[in-house]
UniProtKB/Swiss-Prot annotation:
Region of interest (Domain I), residue spans: 1-63
Family as reported in the entry's similarity comment: Belongs to the RuvA family.
Region (Flexible linker): 143-151
GO MF, one example: ATP binding
Gene symbol of the encoding locus: ruvA
InterPro entries: DNA_helicase_Holl-junc_RuvA_I, Hlx-hairpin-Hlx_DNA-bd_motif, NA-bd_OB-fold, RuvA, RuvA_2-like, RuvA_C, RuvA_C_sf
Pfam families per record: HHH_5, RuvA_C, RuvA_N
Domain description: Has three domains with a flexible linker between the domains II and III and assumes an 'L' shape. Domain III is highly mobile and contacts RuvB.
Residue ranges of the region described as Domain III: 151-194
Keyword field contains Transmembrane helix: no
Keywords, ordered alphabetically: Cytoplasm, DNA damage, DNA recombination, DNA repair, DNA-binding
GO CC annotation, single: cytoplasm
Name of this protein: Holliday junction branch migration complex subunit RuvA
Its job: The RuvA-RuvB-RuvC complex processes Holliday junction (HJ) DNA during genetic recombination and DNA repair, while the RuvA-RuvB complex plays an important role in the rescue of blocked DNA replication forks via replication fork reversal (RFR). RuvA specifically binds to HJ cruciform DNA, conferring on it an open structure. The RuvB hexamer acts as an ATP-dependent pump, pulling dsDNA into and through the RuvAB complex. HJ branch migration allows RuvC to scan DNA until it finds its consensus sequence, where it cleaves and resolves the cruciform DNA.
């Protein structure tokens, strides 16, 4: 129904943005990746997907068509709803997610919020033929478990009172492989406080 919205960012929350279009504020559920790319007051185009439920209409929006496309593929998987799909895309970029699906990396997929081993297997089974293999750029650093600094940063944020989900989202949003644990924590705290 809505392909995209062009408007001004009125407010930003961890996983939602409010976009004002011609005097109407649209609450759009989004991912950490999309939310981290914008600031309050920015003029943006958000690519959207309308979810119709018995008791509500929800808009999910993304800053890139690739992220929207992957979201739509994820919600086509049985037992994956829009919230879980959005959580998965908060944990992984579409390219990284495609690489995990094509390499059948159940372990990596099951680290996303709301995804266990069975769900990861289902994602691989149902999407392995739907993922565009030509656009996937393999980053072989993804396939080693060398994210010790991230895990330490998440643990530190949790010790400061943030939930595991908030901590993981913040660390993912500020991730830079060249940063040490201390710098990741500092950036994540700034991100959580904005």
């Amino acid at each position: 129904m809505f392909e995209y919205l062009k408007g001004t960012v009125a407010d930003i929350l961890i996983d939602k943005i409010i976009v004002e279009v011609n005097g109407i504020g649209y609450r759009i559920h989004s991912t950490i990746h999309s939310v981290s790319q914008i600031k309050k007051g920015d003029a943006i185009t958000v690519y959207t997907h309308l979810v119709v439920r018995e008791d509500e209409l929800s808009l999910y929006g993304f800053m890139s068509i690739e992220e929207l496309d992957m979201f739509q593929k994820l919600i086509s998987v049985s037992k994956i709803g829009p919230k879980v799909a959005s959580g998965i895309l908060s944990a992984y970029t579409p390219n990284k997610l495609s690489a995990y699906i094509l390499s059948k990396d159940i372990s990596a997929l099951s680290k996303a919020p709301g995804v266990g081993k069975k769900t990861a297997e289902r994602i691989i089974l149902e999407l392995k033929d739907k993922v565009d293999k030509t656009n996937v750029v393999y980053d072989y650093t993804l396939f080693n478990d060398d994210h010790k600094d991230d895990d330490e940063a998440v643990q530190a944020l949790m010790a400061l009172g943030y939930s595991k989900l908030e901590s993981e989202k913040a660390v993912e949003a500020v991730r830079d492989m060249s940063l040490g644990t201390e710098d990741v924590i500092k950036r994540a705290l700034k991100w959580l406080m904005k």
